[in-house]
Amino acid sequence: MAHFYLIRHGEPTYDNLLEYGFFGFGRDLAPLTEEGKRQVEITAKDTRLKAAALIVSSPYTRALQTAQIISRETGLRVEVELDLHEWVPDWENHYTTSEESFALAREFTKYRGEYPPGEIFRWETVSHMRVRMRRVADKYAKYDKVIFVGHGMAFRSLTYIEKMSPAEIVECIYEKGQPNCEYSFT
């Protein structure tokens, strides 16, 4: 049984992404704002984090920046896990704005994260997200305490979380083979 500290990345900025031609998956190159960096610096000082064995991060820029700030404070090494990425709003990577991503998230919520029988949408299902998140959790369940830096929607597929604020820590006890949690659509 492992003790995970799930930390959502700090506040990001999506300004100027289109200026660089970044859309779809390219939006995940968004860095933290100055406020986001300050949020993480406060979180990084939380004494609970000192007991962790390592930091495991999503590959997205906002998560990697968050992990780097926490690593600097704790002295822990950072591992990157591709499966720790955020929910995929558009498998075809055609969306260009936050508004379009939010519309896809509303559709995801409307259908409770699963495609109706016979239909396929652009977004990743809760079931798919849960499989990849559990794959990462299972890999690190051998450690006593681990910090995971990632994303709110993805973390909600691993343990019941109503909502996560930027740089918030949610503690989670995890054991391989445990039952799936309820996914919060709030």
Task: Please place each PLM-identified region on the residue numbering.
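A short, acidic, amphipathic alpha-helical segment used as a generic capping/interface helix at domain edges
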Residues: M129-A141
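Phosphate-handling substructures
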Residues: G26-P31, R72-V131, E182
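Generic beta-sheet signal
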Residues: F4, D144-G152
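Short, active-site-adjacent cap segments at secondary-structure transitions
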Residues: T13, A63-L64, E86-V88, A154-R156
